[in-house]
């Protein structure tokens, strides 16, 4: 890179005609490539564009690192000045990408670094009860669909407290979102001590797996 700094601005075109930078390649799925952080640091030092989006899509390297749960790469990107709240990801901001794809480690990292939590479903998925309460009490009130989607996301994140809050606001215990063929009980079923309590609570309130609902 020292001998050929112009490589930092290289764009690679895929079969669909979309172009991506070497920073995107370093952050691409599944992430966690050997020396990923060091490679990104080297590219930034050589002048790589932090905010350059994939041509035609607008996703920045931080969006891709978020979707891959690659905290090592994200740390270098954020330290270099990457926009924590860049729009136009496959789901939205880097944080929204992380939450939507269930990448909890990097979601927490982004919140800790100051990413905005300005969506009901993001607060629910991350178990941010006080932030969720603000959304639930502000005007205009969230719609039924927004309540249901946030409830599903709370279960996605294994967050029993925010799930209960949304259930008390009328969430459908068996809501099936358009973007995932799983009920709240299905998506909550990756067991750990926190999720086990959530799964038990869902069952106590009549939640069913999708196989039962299809019968």
Give the ranges of each region predicted by the language model.
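N-terminal segments that cap or nucleate solenoid repeat domains
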Residues: 1-22, 126-146, 150, 162
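Ankyrin repeat A-helix N-terminal signature
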Residues: 25-36, 64-70, 97-103, 122-128, ...
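A generic tandem-repeat structural signature
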Residues: 41, 48-97
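Ankyrin repeat boundary signal
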Residues: 9-14, 50-54, 84-87, 119, ...
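Ankyrin repeat domain, specifically the short helix-to-loop turn at the C-terminus of the second helix
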Residues: 1-7, 39-49, 75-83, 109-115, ...
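Leucine-rich solenoid repeat scaffolds
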Residues: 92-112, 182-215
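Start-of-repeat signature of ankyrin repeats
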Residues: 15, 19, 57-58, 91, ...
């Amino acid at each position: 890179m020292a001998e050929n700094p112009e490589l930092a601005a290289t764009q690679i075109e895929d079969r669909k005609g979309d172009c991506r930078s070497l920073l995107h390649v370093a952050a691409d799925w599944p992430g966690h490539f050997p020396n990923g952080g060091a490679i990104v640091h080297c590219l930034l030092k050589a002048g790589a564009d932090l905010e350059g989006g994939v041509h035609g899509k607008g996703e920045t390297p931080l969006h891709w690192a978020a979707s891959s749960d690659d905290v090592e790469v994200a740390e270098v990107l954020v330290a270099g000045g990457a926009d924590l709240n860049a729009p136009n990801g496959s789901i939205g901001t880097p944080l929204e990408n992380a939450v939507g794809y269930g990448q909890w480690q990097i979601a927490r990292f982004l919140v800790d670094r100051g990413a905005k939590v300005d969506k009901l479903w993001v607060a629910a998925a991350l178990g941010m009860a006080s932030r969720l309460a603000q959304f639930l009490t502000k005007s205009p009130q969230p719609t039924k669909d927004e309540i249901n989607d946030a409830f599903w996301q709370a279960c996605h994140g294994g967050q029993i407290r925010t799930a209960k809050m949304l259930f008390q606001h009328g969430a459908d215990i068996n809501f099936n979102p358009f973007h995932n063929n799983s009920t709240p009980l299905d998506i909550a079923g990756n067991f750990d001590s926190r999720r086990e309590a959530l799964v038990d609570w869902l069952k106590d309130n009549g939640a069913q797996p999708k196989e039962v609902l299809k019968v």
